[in-house]
From Swiss-Prot:
Name of the protein described by the UniProt record: UPF0102 protein Shew_0226
Protein family (similarity comment): Belongs to the UPF0102 family.
Signal peptide interval: none
GO molecular function list: nucleic acid binding
One Pfam family, short name: UPF0102
The species this protein was found in: Shewanella loihica (strain ATCC BAA-1088 / PV-4)
Domain of life assignment: Bacteria
Length: 114
C-alpha cells in the first residue's frame, strides 16, 4: 500500500469514527489537531466534558488489532497535545481520553482508555 493509500484509509476510518461518535451524541469540536510533539485525531464534547479521541484502524487482526497499535509513546504524545490544546484555548473543564478501534467492519469504543 502506498503512503497516499494509507492516508486515504486513515481518513476513511476517522470519518467512520466521527459518524459513529456523533450517533452516540458527541459533538465535534475539531479534528486532526497537530503540534510538533503530537496529534489529536478528534476533539469532541459530551455536555461540559471535553473528549480527546485516538482513532486506530486495522484492515484485519492478522498482525494484531487496532487496540494493540497504541503505544505508550503515542499515549504520552496525545496527553501532551491535549494539555497544550486546553492551555492554548483556556479550557478549564473535565476531559477524558477515548480510543476508537476499528478492525475491518468492527468498531470498539473504549471510554477513559488512558
Amino acid at each position: 500500500m502506498t503512503s497516499a493509500e494509507h492516508l486515504t484509509k486513515g481518513q476513511q476510518a476517522e470519518d467512520r469514527a466521527l459518524a459513529y461518535l456523533e450517533q452516540q451524541g458527541l459533538k465535534l469540536v475539531e479534528r486532526n489537531v497537530r503540534y510538533p510533539f503530537g496529534e489529536i485525531d478528534l476533539i469532541m464534547r459530551q455536555g461540559h466534558k471535553w473528549i480527546f479521541i485516538e482513532v486506530k484502524y486495522r484492515q484485519s487482526k492478522q498482525f494484531g488489532g487496532a487496540l494493540q497499535a497504541v503505544s505508550r509513546g503515542k499515549i504520552a504524545r496525545l496527553n501532551r497535545a491535549a494539555s497544550h490544546y486546553m492551555q492554548l484555548n483556556q479550557i478549564d473543564a473535565q476531559c477524558r481520553f477515548d480510543l476508537l478501534a476499528i478492525d475491518g467492519d468492527d468498531i470498539q469504543w473504549i471510554t477513559n482508555a488512558f
